[in-house]
Curated annotation (Swiss-Prot):
It catalyses: N(1)-methylguanosine(37) in tRNA(Phe) + pyruvate + S-adenosyl-L-methionine = 4-demethylwyosine(37) in tRNA(Phe) + 5'-deoxyadenosine + L-methionine + CO2 + H2O. Residues 83-241 form the Flavodoxin-like domain. Keywords: 4Fe-4S, Iron, Iron-sulfur, Lyase, Metal-binding, Nucleotide-binding, S-adenosyl-L-methionine, tRNA processing. This is S-adenosyl-L-methionine-dependent tRNA 4-demethylwyosine synthase TYW1. SUPFAM superfamilies: Flavoproteins, Radical SAM enzymes. Gene3D superfamilies: 3.40.50.360, Aldolase class I. Residues 253-356 are annotated as: Disordered. Residues 403-649 form the Radical SAM core domain. Probable component of the wybutosine biosynthesis pathway. Wybutosine is a hyper modified guanosine with a tricyclic base found at the 3'-position adjacent to the anticodon of eukaryotic phenylalanine tRNA. Catalyzes the condensation of N-methylguanine with 2 carbon atoms from pyruvate to form the tricyclic 4-demethylwyosine, an intermediate in wybutosine biosynthesis.
């Protein structure tokens, strides 16, 4: 009983203690639970933060890996493997352009291959360009009658046939990317840049893709888009390089290929065009810009959304205010552009009013290398090799033999470097410009003559103290007595030619003017000269076209009319015949008929001079007749001309003179000129305003025996000493 009571008391005591202190116990429990909850919350938060950091690090690593992967793929992706530059050149211009372009492309880090079309077989190789990822550039010139240069003939022939051969298929060159730059002269209007246009068209017909519009370089400085063919090429080259940079970056907006004529016109503005906006702004002054505003167009499958254009024409009400704002902004920009356009049109009109200079930097460089001293913007003077020869007492030119000029006192010049022909035998290297009328800036005749004499005298002064130069002839050479207007070009094209001639005669300088028989009206209006030449390079229409390569479509009628105009002249007139073996030596009867038209006082017959190998001409030494052949031709021609005889010979120049019998006075030839008498007659003509006329027989002089045909000297002046060169290289230039 006591034990159970004690146990109960013990339990009761403790329970009562707990009951009495229950508030303390609750507080401790609450504090403990709070501490546990707080610690658990803190631990959970830290764990979450750690997981977030880990996940973020993993995400960054994943993104970095993805970025590296994309970069690696991009680096491995090749958009342009290289550039192949094809050139077809006759005179070397397009070849030179090809090398210039290659240098610029190399700077972009791309491999470049220069390909002469003559050495390339398109049948075996061209199809490879459809998968090569190369850009093929074609620089090709247009030659005579719209034909390609000899080096590009086979390539063009194959390409034309392939584009029209169903066996190749219309997608034969699909995937090939190309650009074309054509070289031509707009003076030849019917054939201007024909070859470049055809190559572009034929490639397009075979589904090749243009990377930019076809461009055209113009040798005619008057109509050239940028003033010269060199400037045209430079402008195109800048555009091409910008286009190439865009292609390198992976742009996929080539020309759609739907522009059949090679003149791409974008309907929508692509992102690549921003690369070229600066160049296009610079060229808004050009008269051709309206036909070639863009260098390429967007592909046909491009979506409107790519250019920021909505797919629907509807506008939400919420966007109406923004739309109105954009419309006002567009109107302001349009008004601003309109004013700018008017200003540019005014500047363009002003530019059109100001003619361009004939001499371009490239022409200046070429002629200077050939020994020309250029005057102003269209004239030049050069020291003839016969002038140098006679200063040394080594003999004069054929004019000295035939007409008695003093070769060391003869100035060879021209007031017009331009010509209306591109003769195959021209020894001026075909560097001079061509044209059918005067459209360049014009210098005054007083300035031209003053500068011509000054430059001629300066060139003579360079011979002071040179071994072999005769002192008396050196002093005489400083005083110009004769002027050969036969240097280069067509002097009669110069609008102030009559004024120039009067200035010459006022200074007692005789005038020997040469024309190419393409300007009959100018011949009729020409004032008297000491001697007027007409080049008669062929006697039939076909051979004249082949040899002279004239610009005029009616060249033959102009030729005939020029000869008829020559017959009306009262002063000394000369036919100049240049014999080219296998070209024009078998046309004796036709030559005789031409003599009957012009009734010249004299006929000079000269064998063509071989000027060395030239890309502009296919003449060789085989085309140069021997002197004996020239003599035989002259004798056979005289047999058909009852009023003419062979008068003089200059063996050194491979030249013969046929003279009208009226110059054989009292049995003696009088082909020489009394220069003092001519000056008296021309002064009287001028003072009388043309009423006191005179004829060729009024200023003749006796021809010395050594100058006559059949003499022992064969036209070499015995007062001089014949000089034989040790080597065969010689200067072939001369009047």
């Amino acid at each position: 009983m006591d034990k159970s009571t004690d146990a109960w008391d013990f339990a009761y005591t403790h329970l009562m203690f707990l009951w009495l202190n229950r508030f303390y116990i609750y507080s401790c429990a609450a504090i403990g639970i709070t501490v546990w909850v707080c610690s658990h919350f803190i631990m959970a938060r830290k764990k979450h933060q750690n997981e977030t950091v880990c996940n973020g690090s993993l995400l960054l690593k994943t993104k970095a890996l993805k970025s590296d992967s994309l970069t690696s793929n991009k680096e491995q992706k090749v958009y342009v493997a290289g550039v192949k530059i094809f050139y077809g050149s006759q005179t070397g211009t397009s070849k030179g352009f090809a090398h210039l372009l290659a240098e610029e492309v190399t700077l972009l880090g791309l491999p470049v291959e220069l390909i002469n079309m003559k050495e390339y077989d398109p049948d075996d190789n061209l199809v490879e360009e459809t998968t090569s990822k190369n850009i093929c550039v074609f620089l090709v010139a247009t030659y005579t009658d719209g034909k390609p240069p000899e080096s590009a003939e086979w390539f063009c022939k194959w390409l034309e046939e392939a584009s029209n051969d169903f066996r190749f298929g219309k997608t034969y060159l699909k995937g090939m990317r190309y650009a074309v730059f054509g070289l031509g002269n707009s003076v030849y209007s019917t054939h201007y840049n024909t070859v470049g246009k055809n190559i572009d068209k034929w490639l397009w017909m075979l589904s090749a893709n243009r990377v930019m519009t076809r461009a055209e370089g113009d040798c005619n400085v008057v109509k050239s888009k940028h003033g010269s063919i060199e400037s045209d090429f430079e402008a195109w080259k800048r555009k091409f390089l910008n286009r190439l940079k865009a292609l390198l970056s992976g742009e996929k907006k080539p020309c759609s290929g739907k522009c059949k004529k090679g003149k791409c016109k974008s309907k929508k503005k692509s992102s690549i065009e921003s690369v070229e906006e600066e160049e296009e702004e610079e060229e808004k002054h050009s008269e051709h810009e309206d036909t070639e505003d863009d260098t390429f167009e967007t592909s046909s499958d491009s979506e409107p959304e790519e250019h920021g254009e909505p797919g629907s024409g509807l506008i939400d009400v919420e966007d109406l205010g923004k739309a109105m704002s954009n419309m006002k902004k567009s109107k302001r920009e349009h008004d601003s552009n309109t004013e700018l356009g008017k200003s540019l049109q005014g500047d363009e009109a002003k530019e059109k009013e100001e003619p361009r200079e004939m001499i371009t930097p490239a022409l200046q460089e070429a002629l200077t290398k050939q020994g020309y001293r250029l005057i102003g913007s269209h004239s030049g003077v050069k020291l003839c090799r016969w002038t140098k020869s006679m200063l040394r007492g080594r003999g004069g030119c054929y004019k000295h033999t035939f007409y008695g000029i003093e070769s060391h006192r003869c100035m060879e010049t021209t007031p017009s470097l331009a010509c209306a022909n591109k003769c195959v035998f021209c020894w001026r290297h075909h560097t001079n410009p061509v044209g059918t009328e005067w459209r360049w800036k014009m210098d005054q005749p007083e300035m031209i003559l003053e500068e011509a004499i000054l430059n001629h005298q300066n060139m003579i002064k360079q011979f002071k103290g040179v071994p072999g130069v005769k002192p008396e002839r050196f002093e005489e050479g400083l005083a110009v007595k004769h002027c050969a207007l036969s240097l280069v070009g067509e002097p009669i094209m110069y609008p102030e030619i009559n004024t120039f001639l009067r200035l010459l005669h006022n200074q007692h300088i005789s005038s020997f003017l040469v024309t190419n028989a393409q300007f009959p009206e100018e011949i009729r209006s020409l004032e008297p000269v000491t001697q007027l030449y007409v080049s008669v390079d062929a006697s039939t229409k076909d051979s004249l076209k082949k040899i002279d390569r004239p610009l005029f479509k009616d060249f033959w009628q102009r030729f005939i009319d020029s000869l008829k105009a020559l017959a009306e002249k009262q002063q000394r007139t000369v036919y100049r015949l240049t014999l080219v073996k296998a070209w024009n030596v078998d046309e004796l009867k036709a030559y005789a008929d031409l003599v009957a038209l012009g009734l010249p006082d004299f006929i000079e017959v000269k064998g063509v001079t071989y000027c060395g190998e030239s890309s502009a001409s296919n003449l060789t030494m085989a085309n140069v007749p021997w002197h004996e052949e020239v003599i035989r031709f002259v004798e056979e021609l005289v047999d058909l001309l009852p009023d003419y005889e062979v008068a003089c010979e200059h063996e050194h120049s491979n030249c013969m003179l046929i003279a009208h019998k009226k110059f054989k006075i009292n049995g003696e030839w009088c082909t020489w000129i009394d220069y003092e008498r001519f000056q008296e007659l021309i002064q009287a003509f001028g003072e009388s305003k043309g009423s006191r006329t005179f004829t060729a027989l009024d200023y003749v002089a006796k021809t010395p025996e050594w100058a006559l045909f059949g003499s022992r000297e064969r036209g070499f002046d015995p007062l001089d000493k014949r000089f034989q060169r040790k080597n065969k290289t010689k200067d072939i230039s001369g009047c």
